[in-house]
């Protein structure tokens, strides 16, 4: 969970609220593209989370997020292979200030051009764990095993040893 203020929680619970989204796309080549509410096609954005790929419970699955968004943009779709999209939700509070909540970093899996629009589909880093791994290669604590998995899958590990051991 991301910590938010009491004012944020009150604003979310109110009958009406003002909010907007912004984001950044960083290509493999290092090009950075910023986008905001003006570039996002209204009603096109979503973030959905799912644990299993089917209707049955499967062992070894992860809780992954999919992000989709359509942008009014002339970015060349071919430059977006494996690009990273960072999304931020901005909520306007009762006093007029804005509180930001980072919504995650996603890797682009599909980029399609529709006239003047760029349609993106991306997944969070949890899908990086979808690979074969021999867990018997290591000996150690739970922390050591998780840290090794994160390193091999190139996923940042945010926990401290004391939180896990």
Task: List PLM regions with ranges.
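Short coil-to-beta transition motif at edge beta-strands of beta-rich domains
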Residues: 78-95
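Short, mixed charged/polar active-site loops
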Residues: 32, 98-103
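Intrinsically disordered, low-complexity coil segments
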Residues: 43, 93-99
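Juxtamembrane "anchor/assembly" segments of surface/extracellular structural proteins
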Residues: 1-80, 116, 121-129, 135
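Short alpha-helical segments and helix-capping/turn motifs at coil-helix boundaries
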Residues: 54, 72, 90-92, 104-107
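Charged- and aromatic-enriched interaction segments used to assemble
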Residues: 97, 112-165
């Amino acid at each position: 969970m991301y910590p938010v203020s009491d004012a944020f929680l009150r604003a979310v619970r109110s009958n009406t609220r003002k909010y907007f989204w912004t984001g950044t796309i960083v290509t493999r080549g290092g090009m950075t593209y910023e986008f905001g509410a003006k570039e996002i096609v209204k009603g096109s954005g979503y973030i959905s989370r799912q644990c299993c790929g089917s209707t049955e419970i499967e062992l070894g699955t992860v809780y992954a997020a999919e992000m989709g968004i359509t942008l009014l943009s002339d970015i060349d779709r071919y430059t977006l292979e494996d690009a990273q999209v960072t999304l931020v939700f901005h909520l306007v509070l009762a006093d007029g200030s804005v509180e930001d909540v980072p919504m995650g970093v996603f890797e682009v899996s599909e980029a399609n051009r529709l006239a003047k629009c760029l349609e993106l589909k991306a997944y969070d880093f949890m899908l990086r764990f979808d690979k074969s791994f021999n867990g018997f290669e290591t000996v150690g604590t739970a922390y050591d095993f998780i840290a090794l998995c994160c390193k091999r899958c190139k996923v940042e590990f945010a926990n401290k040893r004391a939180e896990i051991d």
